[in-house]
Amino acid sequence: MALKLMYITDKPEVAQIAETAGVDRIFVDLEYIGKADRQGGMDTVQSRHTLDDVKRISDAITTAELLVRVNPIHDATDEYVSSEEEISTAIDNGADIVMLPFFKSVDEVKRFLSDVNKRAKTMLLLETPEAVEI
């Protein structure tokens, strides 16, 4: 298995430069639900990328894969759409790979895989003790 170079951006012109430089995957980071609580007080970057950014990046790149990290599994609220809608829109907007972060159960993974429904590659980000135990 070869090393895959990834670059996180929501700027199409930067994505094109990265792609030209040999980056294999352009990464759009939609994850924000609960992130401030999980990373509060830490010196970390919290992206505010959008589903519209997925489309803009998809339109800008030609050879790199488009990796999109969605939010952890969630239902719709007044503030955000459901996981199913977020995942479907990401794929419709050009995601080649959809990443599920911060999952804690097999049921969440099953829901994620069902929502993707083989329309894109999937990637699981193991970052909880519960995920490691699955």
Q: Would you name each region that the model predicts?
A:
Residues 1-5:
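Extreme N-terminal starter segment of soluble prokaryotic enzymes
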Residues 6-9, 121-134:
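Active-site glycine- and acidic-residue-rich loops that bind
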Residues 13-25, 30-111, 115, 125-127:
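Active-site beta->alpha loop and helix N-cap motifs at the rims of alpha/beta catalytic domains
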Residues 117-119:
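Short gly/pro-enriched beta-turn/loop segments at secondary-structure junctions
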